[in-house]
Every structure is written in C-alpha cells, then in structure tokens.
Amino acid sequence: MSGRSVRAETRSRAKDDIKKVMAAIEKVRKWEKKWVTVGDTSLRIFKWVPVTDSKEKEKSKSNNTAAREPNGFPSDASANSSLLLEFQDENSNQSSVSDVYQLKVDSSTNSSPSPQQSESLSPAHTSDFRTDDSQPPTLGQEILEEPSLPASEVADEPPTLTKEEPVPVETQTTEEEEDSGAPPLKRFCVDQPVVPQTTSES
C-alpha cells in the first residue's frame, strides 16, 4: 500500500513540474545550451537554459552590485564565489571547444594530408588540451580529449586500398614452415620412388 502512494505522489509531483516547465517555456522566447552547476555540488551539466534579455541582466547586475558594495567590499564571500563560479561556467569550455572546431576545420581543408603534416598537427593540439590540468576534468571535458588522433584518421576520406600480387602457394608453405620455429617437416616428392633409409651406423 505504501509503495502505491509513494508512486502516486511522485507522479503528481512530476505532473506539477511539467506544468511549471511548460508555463516557463511559453514565457521564454530564446533558449541556449550552457554548462550549469547542480546545486552546491561541483557537478556540472550541459543543458538548455532560457536566455534572459540584456536589459534584465543589466538590472539584476546593478541591483546586486548596489546591495553588495556599501563599503566597497562584497557583503559576503560566498556570494562572490558563486559569481565567480557562474563566470567560470560560462567561459570554461569555450577555448577547448574552439580548439576542437579548429582541428575539424584543419582536417576538412586538408583533404589528404601527408603523414608528416598529420604528425606535426597532432602534438600541437594535444598540448592545447593539456593546458588546464590545474582543474580536474569535468563531464564535458573528458569527451573533448578524444580528438588527439592524427588528422589523417579524422579526415572524412575512406582509406585507400592497394592491390597486392598473389604469392605462389609453394613460397607460402616454405615461409610458414620457417616462421613456425618447429623443425621442418618431411617432404615427399611424387616423381621419385620412396627408398626406405636404413641406419646402419653403429
């Protein structure tokens, strides 16, 4: 009985949340994807956030600065740190995203780069990804470290196939016997009669 009531309660709560979200969607005209910190934790997620008008932003900023700086100092350090977190959330991944975009542009403009070019491109881009090792990687940054592959592997062209000449069967068997490391097998010739060997050495 208690399980059903709990499920019904969460269902009704979810319906209320959906109604709130739908009402907010109707009011908001523009949305954008942003990195957002979840509560007081250090967990960050990439989600759709309503875009506030620049006028509203200016009003909220002016109200915050007037309320916080009567003496020229912030009223509390926690508010200042939350502002710093918001600033980092907005700008933290833009540089690495632009690096990845630049890598994709480079690989698309060079349709068939030579191996020397691809080797020279990849170390430069991997050093860009390693520049912010002072901060632990977040959920979004782990994905961005993948494009450290050479540009030749990232290119959209399919690999070219080369035609090899077939090797005669006789040479294949001799190579296999030599490579196996085992003693050579006895070979029988069809043309010559088989003569049993007698070991008369004593």
From Swiss-Prot:
InterPro entries cross-referenced by the UniProt entry: BCL7 (IPR006804)
GO biological process, one term: regulation of mitotic metaphase/anaphase transition
Species this protein is from: Mus musculus (Mouse)
Protein name: B-cell CLL/lymphoma 7 protein family member B
Annotated positions of the Phosphoserine modification: 114, 118, 120, 122, 127, 148, 152
Record-linked PANTHER family: B-CELL CLL_LYMPHOMA 7 PROTEIN FAMILY MEMBER B, BCL7 RELATED
Biased composition (Polar residues): 90-99
Pfam family, one: BCL_N
Keywords: Apoptosis, Differentiation, Phosphoprotein, Wnt signaling pathway
Record region (Disordered): 53-202
Record's function text: Positive regulator of apoptosis. Plays a role in the Wnt signaling pathway, negatively regulating the expression of Wnt signaling components CTNNB1 and HMGA1. Involved in cell cycle progression, maintenance of the nuclear structure and stem cell differentiation. May play a role in lung tumor development or progression.
Family of this protein: Belongs to the BCL7 family.
Lineage of the organism: Eukaryota, Metazoa, Chordata, Craniata, Vertebrata
